[in-house]
């Protein structure tokens, strides 16, 4: 896992140079949003179960996927879906705090699409639920933090698509 600071420093180090104006600007932007990120993470942490619950209600609960024969029909499958959404929310929050999506590749996305396909998990419905979670989260944390979190939810969706 990297964070925005490590990413900027590593990039300059690999090139054997000091931080240039662009690198300094990236660091300034990251530090300027630090308080926003921490407040958003605090709000998300305090409301994680409700965020997931609302996202499921908005996107999956009354669809064919939860009816008999649907992929989320049994309690076990439904619980697995809730667990996965909670996992995505947690790791998107970590990535937002770090200002870098690398943790999503390392801990979430590597091999996930293939695993879902082999298990018959509907990726479209998963992406729909993540998008609903993005919307619910933005409503809680506000426009600026919601936009920042949206980057990482979208990153997960792109990795699954």
Swiss-Prot record:
Question: What InterPro entries does the database record attribute to this sequence?
Answer: Allophycocyanin_b (IPR006245), Globin-like_sf (IPR009050), Phycobilisome_asu/bsu (IPR012128), Phycobilisome_asu/bsu_sf (IPR038719)
Question: Where does this protein hold (2R,3E)-phycocyanobilin?
Answer: 81
Q: One GO term of the cellular component aspect?
A: plasma membrane-derived thylakoid membrane
- Where are the N4-methylasparagine modifications? 71
Description of post-translational modifications: Contains one covalently linked phycocyanobilin chromophore.
UniProt keyword list: Antenna complex, Bile pigment, Chromophore, Electron transport, Membrane, Methylation, Photosynthesis, Phycobilisome, Thylakoid, Transport
Q: Which GO terms describe its biological process?
A: photosynthesis
The protein's assembly and partners: Heterodimer of an alpha and a beta chain.
Protein name (Swiss-Prot/TrEMBL): Allophycocyanin beta chain
């Amino acid at each position: 896992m990297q964070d925005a600071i490590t990413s900027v420093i590593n990039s300059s180090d690999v090139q054997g140079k000091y931080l240039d104006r662009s690198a300094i600007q990236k660091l300034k932007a990251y530090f300027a949003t630090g308080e926003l990120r921490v407040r958003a993470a605090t709000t998300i942490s305090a409301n994680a179960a409700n965020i997931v619950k609302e996202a499921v209600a908005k996107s999956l609960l009354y669809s064919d996927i939860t009816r008999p024969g649907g992929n989320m029909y049994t309690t076990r499958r439904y619980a697995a879906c809730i667990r996965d959404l909670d996992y995505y929310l947690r790791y998107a929050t970590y990535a937002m705090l770090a200002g870098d999506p690398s943790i999503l590749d390392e801990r979430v996305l590597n091999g996930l699409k293939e695993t879902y396909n082999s298990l018959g998990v509907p990726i479209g419905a998963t992406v729909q639920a993540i998008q609903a979670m993005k919307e619910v989260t933005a409503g809680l944390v506000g426009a600026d933090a919601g936009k920042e979190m949206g980057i990482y939810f979208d990153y997960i969706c792109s990795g699954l698509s």
